[in-house]
Regions:
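Interfacial loop-to-helix transition and helix-capping segments at the boundaries
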Residues: 2-3, 32-44, 142-155, 196-219, ...
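Functionally critical transmembrane alpha-helices in membrane proteins and complexes, commonly lining
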Residues: 3-62, 78-85, 126, 324, ...
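Aromatic-anchored segments of alpha-helical transmembrane domains
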Residues: 14-22, 138, 183-195, 267-279, ...
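Juxtamembrane transmembrane-helix termini
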Residues: 44-78, 83-109, 221-228, 302, ...
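Specific transmembrane alpha-helix
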Residues: 44-60, 152-169, 180-239, 245, ...
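Membrane-interface helix-loop-helix regions
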Residues: 84-153, 189, 196, 290-296
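Alpha-helical transmembrane segments of multi-pass integral membrane proteins
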Residues: 213, 217, 260-374
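Membrane-proximal cytoplasmic C-terminal regulatory module of class A 7TM GPCRs
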Residues: 314-316, 375-403
């Protein structure tokens, strides 16, 4: 995994967790006043871009048969589904606990909130069934149910399948690039047509369904092919064997210059991305450019060098990246328990609640990563390897197992 991309994923997961607490759950105060945090839901689109790039880099040359595609989907299923099931269960238990407390207090004449205890369809078995079938985010329902960030996990799973089918059906590289570009173009067209007749509040990327994921995921695929093309270009004379005797100072100066250009481009793209996220509510249809700028940021980080890349290499951000999926899916459980406190406590004490929230999210994420995410991912690799090779003796932890 490219370390700068890993760190970027961690930052995005943290921002989404803060958004759901301070903005979505209306804790208010700082940092909810920051425009970037108010629109941090957009960083889900960054996740999709990263996923598209990673899938293309890891699998575009390996998905050459139905058996390979089946093994790939097994890996992706075991990567996503076990943690989804566990965190959906923890959210259900948290809601059950909170509602039970409300019910007990209601019998004592103490009313909390406007809703009656258990006065909503959170435990509707039909909704839970859609959740467990990973259909909650594809557009069948519009409700935010259970572990509501998991809508994007639902979309991502079906994007994985779309990607595998595309790689199987279209073999020439140019045709794959054209197909991916067509999917991106169709997704843009979908939003433009939808927004042309939608009420003003609905003219936003903050929607659910496959088109939003397709728009960003297949940009990630295009990034991979573009970077691969760049890497395959003939090297300049400075990098050719004929220039082997060139002065070391000149070579170092050229490398320093290239690094300076890359760093400047990374900073500019990052600042532009944050500016557009901050101004999303004012952009109208121009907000469609935001996923494209995210794609540019990812492209500039792929070399894993430059000033922004070095920042993302730092230990705290690498830790966030390693635990980003767990952070993304566990934070709603913690938020369910602390929600009333975050809204009730004024500043500056609210910041203590925020620190407690993050501490609990990080702690829970460490547990779920160690006991759910990582071991089940390894089991998926073992099963996929058996399917692909017919080797029934594959074992967990075998370093030869593909990722």
């Amino acid at each position: 995994m490219i370390r700068s991309i890993e760190g970027l994923r961690g930052v995005a997961a943290l921002l989404v967790a803060l958004f759901h607490a301070y903005v979505y759950s209306r804790w208010g105060g700082f940092p909810a006043t920051l425009g970037v945090l108010q629109h941090a839901w957009l960083f889900v689109d960054l996740f999709f871009v990263i996923s598209g790039y990673v899938m293309a880099a890891a699998y575009s040359d390996r998905l050459d048969s139905g058996r390979a595609a089946f093994g790939y989907m097994i890996r992706r299923f075991f990567r996503l589904y076990p943690l989804h099931v566990v965190t959906t269960a923890t959210v259900l238990l948290a809601v059950l606990g909170i509602q039970t407390v409300k019910l007990v207090l209601a019998h004592q004449g103490i009313r909390i909130g406007r809703e009656e205890p258990f006065g909503f369809d959170f435990f509707d078995l039909k909704l839970l069934g859609l959740d467990m079938l990973l259909l909650q985010g594809v557009g069948i329902i519009r409700k935010e149910i259970h572990n509501y960030p998991s809508w994007s996990i639902s979309v991502e799973f079906w994007l994985y399948l779309m990607f595998a089918l595309l790689m199987l059906a279209v073999r020439p590289r140019v045709a794959r690039i054209a197909a991916s570009a067509l999917i991106v173009g169709m997704s843009v067209a979908y939003f433009l047509v939808y927004w042309s007749s939608a009420p003003e509040p609905l003219r936003t990327l903050d929607t659910r369904g496959l088109p939003r994921g397709m728009l960003s995921f297949f940009q990630g695929v295009l990034i991979y092919y573009f970077y691969r093309w760049l890497a395959a270009r003939p090297k300049s004379a400075a990098g050719s064997p004929a220039a082997a005797g060139a002065p070391v100072v000149a070579s170092a100066a050229a490398m320093t210059q290239r690094m300076g250009v890359l760093s400047a481009a990374q900073v500019a793209a990052t600042v532009l991305a944050l500016y557009l996220v901050d101004r999303q509510h004012l952009l109208g249809t121009a907000q469609l450019v935001i996923p494209f700028v995210f794609a540019l940021v990812v492209l500039l980080l792929v070399p894993d060098r430059g000033i922004v890349a070095r920042l993302l290499h730092t230990r705290p951000l690498q830790w966030l990246g390693l635990h980003s999926y767990s952070i993304y899916l566990t934070h709603v459980t913690v938020l369910t328990v602390l929600d009333w406190l975050g809204r009730a406590v004024p500043e500056p004490a609210k910041h203590l609640v925020g620190l407690l929230y993050l501490a609990l999210v990080f702690g829970m994420s460490m547990v779920t990563y160690r006991f759910v995410e990582a071991p089940w991912r390894e089991r998926g690799k073992v099963l996929a390897a058996r399917i692909e090779s017919g080797d029934t003796f594959a074992r967990e932890g075998d370093p030869s197992l593909p990722r």
